[in-house]
């Protein structure tokens, strides 16, 4: 992998004080975090949530509580990295990256996080307090916006990395 200077004169600093090389790495860090989250969400969509949907109501409370505890440990770091790097790319767009891509990435992240907060978290809360057979099935259905958004973030991240000259 190589990082191109993106046509910036040596020593030029961007508004946040980042050099073009740092911004190139920031794009790659953002892409990596998006890839991690896309991988996790596809696993959740096709393996974990269907299994939760089959959890008997008498054991659903314990499973839901443990799911929330364990999942938080897995997604906390990549979500934080993704969030901060997305904000940084909005504030300080790298040269060579078309302006629409950081905003598209932020919009897709807002969809993923909004779906998490407004759809998934309430359903997990319901499963942990008052489980029924419909909650697991609804988790599978309402998880699709997150799955699509995080998958599309990977595409946006690859486009930004290519525009920065990180590949090729």
What are these regions (language model features)?
Residues 75-89, 146-156:
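Core segments of transmembrane alpha-helices
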Residues 159-168:
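Juxtamembrane boundary at the C-terminal end of a transmembrane helix
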Residues 88-110:
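Transmembrane helix-loop-helix
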Residues 110-118:
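Mid-bilayer segments of alpha-helical transmembrane spans in multi-pass integral membrane proteins
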Residues 23-81, 125-138:
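Interfacial loop at the N-terminal end of multi-pass membrane proteins
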Residues 2-4:
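Basic polycationic patches enriched in arginine
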């Amino acid at each position: 992998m190589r990082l191109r200077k993106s046509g910036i004169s040596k020593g030029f600093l961007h508004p946040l004080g980042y050099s073009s090389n740092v911004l190139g790495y920031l794009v790659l860090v953002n892409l990596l975090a998006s890839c991690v989250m896309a991988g996790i969400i596809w696993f959740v969509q096709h393996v974990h949530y269907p299994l939760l949907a089959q959890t008997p109501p008498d054991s659903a409370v314990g499973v839901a509580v443990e799911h929330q505890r364990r999942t938080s440990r897995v997604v906390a770091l990549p979500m934080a990295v993704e969030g901060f790097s997305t904000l940084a790319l909005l504030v300080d767009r790298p040269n060579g990256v078309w302006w629409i891509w950081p905003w598209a990435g932020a919009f897709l992240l807002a969809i993923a996080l909004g779906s998490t907060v407004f759809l998934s978290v309430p359903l997990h809360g319901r499963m942990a307090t008052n489980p029924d057979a419909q909650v697991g099935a609804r988790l599978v259905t309402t998880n699709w916006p997150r799955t699509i958004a995080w998958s599309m973030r990977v595409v946006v991240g690859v486009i930004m990395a290519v525009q920065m000259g990180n590949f090729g």
